[in-house]
Design a protein with these regions (language model features):
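Short beta->alpha connector loops
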Residues: 109-113, 167-168, 280-281, 362-364
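ATP-dependent carboxylate-amine ligase
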Residues: 1-11, 177-178, 214, 237-432
Length: 432
């Protein structure tokens, strides 16, 4: 009851904000994968010309999204009436204050059918980006078609839309009613694409962005994995559509970096290459991360894979598919964390001939992984799993060459660290 009251008040304040600030543009980022990286890349490029508001935290729900749009931090005591009264006061101040931003870039997250319709009640998007339609929250959605209907609704509720051609099946195009839709992807025939000319671990990808408005734009982007280029492609496309020059886009491009826990390359023990993709996991994202690991030139490669949560009835099949992707000619070890990977992924990987070791929780895996890295100097090791109950970033922390790199890991706030301490304490108690 109280949550519903807060939500309705926040939605009304957002409506009032855009009435009071008609020149402020709202860009929404939806999709099954890569929303945060796409949002961050868009903000980096647009900042070269415009005043941009973007909350890097995962503020994408019915309560947190309005807060991010208004530029207000979530209160520490979310059940306190007085804390929310203070939030409402700040919201009124935002409405009354002259424009301090030109563009707001907002992530729109959906967990179930109807979530996007809730956003549509009070948001009028000038532009929408849909990053992909892949299995997510299948316990709630049931089918991929339901996921598509939900995510593509963002495109239909916007003035114009950009669709990731690589990660959205062409069969779902019939769901689009918006006539002003463009596509982006790693390859042509997407209207916005990228031609890779070179890759370097330090510098990233060098090549040419192919655009409608500005032709080819040469550039270098410090990201890892060709699928990590897609958020930058979306950002370049948005920059073009927002009237930026080639020089402005190139300048913004130089600032783009991987977001914490999203294909971030770090130095590890024994000269190892740590590929930190621990923020979350889904079948499409994990598949792309594995393919990227296979492309790394290293004496050996190791995959540390945690459960993919909220897969519902699809969990067995999706985990098994990933297990079948595990190639013994490419991987010296497949190390799993969690019950679903042990039950479904590990047997499939073993059947293919992979060396597999399973662990109930992340911290239990640490001594074994350290031992492997001591024996396999210079290995490339991928870490990827869902956040709830997996927390593979805590394993990465123990593998870092320098403790200074802890700042680059995901979920390191005091609140998150307390949550993880309590979780691992419960796991330890259950084992005793």
């Amino acid at each position: 009851m109280f949550k519903s009251y807060v939500q309705k008040r926040l939605e009304e304040y957002v409506r009032q904000y855009f009435v009071a600030h008609p020149n402020v543009k709202l860009i929404g980022v939806a999709g099954s994968v890569g929303k945060t990286s796409t949002k961050a890349a868009i903000a980096e490029i647009l900042t070269e010309k415009y005043r941009v508001r973007m909350e890097l935290k995962n503020y994408n729900t019915e309560i947190s999204a309005p807060m991010a749009i208004l530029g207000i931090d979530m209160p520490e005591k979310v059940r306190s009436f007085w804390a929310w009264r203070k939030v409402f006061k700040i919201a009124k101040q935002r409405i009354a204050t002259p424009d301090d931003v030109d563009i707001i870039v907002q992530e729109l997250g959906v967990d179930k059918i109807g979530d996007m319709a809730s956003f549509a009640r009070y948001l009028k998007l000038d532009m929408a980006i849909v990053t992909g339609v892949t299995p997510e929250h299948m316990e709630q959605f049931g089918t991929l078609e339901n996921v598509a209907k939900e995510e593509l609704m963002a495109a239909n509720m916007a003035g114009s839309a950009l669709i990731n051609r690589d990660d959205i099946d062409a069969g779902f195009a019939q769901m689009l009613t918006n006539q002003n839709v463009s596509t982006y992807g790693n390859n042509e025939p997407a209207e916005y694409s990228f031609a890779v000319e070179d890759f370097d671990f330090e510098k990233g990808y060098t090549g040419r962005f192919r655009t409608v408005e500005l032709g080819d734009i040469p550039g270098t982007v410090r990201v890892f994995g060709e699928h990590s280029l897609r958020p930058v492609l979306a950002a370049v496309a948005v920059g073009c559509k927002m009237g930026m020059s080639r020089e402005e886009i190139q300048a913004g491009m130089k600032r783009v970096r991987p977001v914490a826990g999203r294909m971030n390359v770090l130095r590890g023990l024994g000269g190892s290459i740590l590929i930190d993709d621990t923020y979350n996991s889904s079948p499409a994202a994990l598949s792309m991360a594995l393919k990227t690991l296979y492309e790394v030139s290293a004496p050996s490669r190791i995959a540390v894979i945690g459960d993919m949560n909220e897969m519902g009835a699809e969990s067995a099949a999706e985990h098994e598919k990933i297990g079948k992707m595990c190639d013994p000619t490419m991987l010296s070890w497949v190390i799993t964390v969690g019950a679903e990977t042990e039950k479904y992924l590990a047997p499939a990987a073993q059947t293919r001939g992979c060396q597999v070791r399973c662990f109930k929780d992340a911290m239990s895996a640490v001594p074994f992984i350290i031992g492997v890295l001591e024996r396999e100097q210079g290995a490339a090791i991928l870490f990827k799993g869902s956040q709830g109950g997996i927390y593979l970033e805590e394993v990465v922390k123990d593998m870092l060459h320098s403790s200074e790199d802890v700042k680059d890991l995901v979920r390191q706030s005091l609140a998150w660290m307390q949550t993880k301490r309590e979780f691992f304490a419960r796991v330890q108690e259950s084992d005793e």
